[in-house]
Amino acid sequence: IPAIKTFDEVQQKIGSDKIQEAMESIGISMNKENIGLASAIGGWSYGISPLEMAGAYATISNNGLYTESHTINYVEVVQTGETFNIDEEIQNNAKQSAYSKASAFMVRQVMLDYTKNGSGNYAYVSGINNVGAKTGTSNWSSSAKNGMAGKSRDLWMSAYTSDYICSVWMGFGKEGIDKGKTTSQYKAYPGKVVQTLLNHLQSKGSQKSYPDQPDDVEQAAMVKGIYPYVSPSEGMSEDMIIQAWFKKGTAPTQSVDS
């Protein structure tokens, strides 16, 4: 599984403490979590709230800059007319997350591409201008009771545009779980909700643009399906070649024939 393989490589290189710091830098509470390989595919003790997830996704469209998630714009004191601009204060206190502008740009471009050309639940949002999205599913363990073993436990879709972020979670409370309900038959619902929200919010078009490409990022050709990455050889079929984003100096230099 690519996510687990990547997580394992990163964990071995920088350690669990650095991973925890990176997660906390984008607003995800890690106080009660034990970081391990299962974390890469949703194996969390307590999990992430939609509010935390939306705040984390906002960094992708905002150059890696983290702004604390909040639901209050301002507070006005009726008796005095005094106004406290909560949103303005939080925006002014935004902090750079653990990852760079270059990383945010590359993640954003990859997500925009596969969302635009995606199938399944991505089809619900693929027609929205400049949208990037990711779905998520977790299943009950093989030891779960009441016939729940291996069945779908909850569903996600989180998405962003240059203006808005939304994160939708779907699952059942104890009563539904006790009745044996699973999310298996409702897989399309998060995508439909995200589609409805963004279509409404974006009905007048985009107000902002994504940040420009950083100077330390470049695009280069590489061969599909080969890792470590290699550059295409002369005369290779175009079907085997894709354009990918790299930090400058890290694009593949060896060809597939080397």
Regions found by a protein language model. Name each.
Residues 47-258:
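A penicillin-recognizing enzyme superfamily signal
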Residues 1-30, 34-62, 110-113:
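Active-site-adjacent helix/loop patches that line small-molecule binding or acyl-intermediate pockets
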